Amino acid sequence: MNPIQKVLASLHSMVIEALEKAKSRDLIKFDQIPEFLIEVPREKEHGDFACNVALLMARQARQAPRAIAEVLVELMEASGRPVEKIEIAGAGFINFFLDRSWLYEIPLMVYKSKDKYGFNGEKAKKVQVEFVSANPTGNLHMGNARGGAIGDTLANILERAGYEVEREFYINDAGNQIEIFTDSMEARYLQLTGHDVQFPENGYAGRDLIDTVRNIIARYGEGLYDLPREERRQIIVDFALEEKIDYIQKTLASFGINYDVWFSEKSLHENGKIMAVFNDLRDKGYIYESEGAWWFKSTAFGDEKDEVVLRANGMPTYFMADIAYHQNKFERGFDWVINVWGADHHGHVARMKGAIEALGYDPARLDILLMQLVRLYRGGNIVRMSKRTGTTVSLDELIEDVGKDAARFFFVMRSPDSHLDFDLELARQKSQENPVYYVQYAHARICSIFRQARAEGITMAEINEIDISCLKEEEELAILRKIADFPEEISIAARTLAPHRIARYVLDLAALFHSFYNHHRVLNDNRALQDARLLLMEITRITIHNALDVLGVAAPEQM
């Protein structure tokens, strides 16, 4: 149990005990205790924690919330708990002000836990996170980049929260887009080998594909023209897909993302899985024929309209393949399946959950995290095109421009459902205006304190000999409170699929450190205070390091 959970459990039991006393003495009439909250209030003057139980009890007790709160506070037994005082605020919120004793337990625990601090070691459930899953038909764009940072950070958070996590990339190597890709590659090959052919109107026109075709010519020469067309097309697309997938793997690896599984959509076609799932849903009455095509009854599950799953030409749609893919996920034993999709896929969510339910699975086991668009800015102007390729800026170009750390941090700073304006100039700045630099600088600054201490022959006392109660300044206590929050932040971020919480958390912790650093000296003439502050600095460094590690960002010792 983490520090915050221990305190919350203690406060929760105190509230329950007071409610039971009130009922037994006929001071408050109620049938059952509602699910009340004890949480950190927004305003500091409202204490360390606030409880809303009185407001929730008002209706069934037929009493004013404030009157209920007054009864409960009178009956609360704070002895043996880290409670200094209890106040009632507003309509009936119960505010708890804690003493420092619980905070003074934090340093020893963090120091001993080190890189494990904030993390639950138990492997509770098996979770799959599927993210990026870009079409292997071009370079990785900013949407892919944001999805990569969000998905990988979320996977890191879930691992730290105690889940067994598998990262997966779904390779869209089948279907209509691959046909268009093949048409495009074949046309470019023929054009570059001197044949007069027209490029497909809806073809992929990126300059990167021309480079791939040149590599095909380097391997096979101009002789593919003489082969039967289907053989020629197969050679071209196999080469191109292999090269593109290799590019995706290497680029994402340079972004700090390494997948456990690369799953081929094509395999679902080849092993008959798609048609097996189609037949199963048809037998269950969820698929019907109309206008020459076959439709899934997604309206039965709250969708606006039914969806085609098998075209009139007998070819399954992308949605049908996706249904089969998701059944495969659950067949592999995942308790929880999470997809990170672009917001343009929002219309796909209801029908996907409906298909899962139609297959007999609990749709609550599937979560789909939608993310909004990214706009790149430089000097206040929107950057629409890459100077190098003439198309949209690619992830590898972004990494080259601002670095992996800045890119990952910027992509997860905002909630996934918020549009992201990415300031390229800010991301490159080596100043405290740059959020990732600000946090990394806090870590490096702490490391410099310890280097200075070593240079002066100063060593911290043994951990059990340090008097933590020397830490009395408000800046010191604020840091301790924030460090105590870290395990709960990990837990909440995992439950709510909110990776941005960790970026915000570590920014706040860095701000508290910088404020302390600007007002107080760590190395000083008071040995007891110096030891306590050195320990405070070390646990701050540990927590910043662990938070940055979750974000996939380096924690440098020097800057």
Curated annotation (Swiss-Prot):
It holds the Pfam family tRNA-synt_1d. GO terms for molecular function: arginine-tRNA ligase activity; ATP binding. A motif ('HIGH' region) lies at residues 134-144. The keyword Membrane does not apply. It is an enzyme of class 6 (ligase). One of its GO terms (biological process) is arginyl-tRNA aminoacylation. PANTHER family: ARGININE--TRNA LIGASE, CYTOPLASMIC, ARGINYL-TRNA SYNTHETASE. Belongs to the class-I aminoacyl-tRNA synthetase family. HAMAP family: Arg_tRNA_synth. This is Arginine--tRNA ligase.
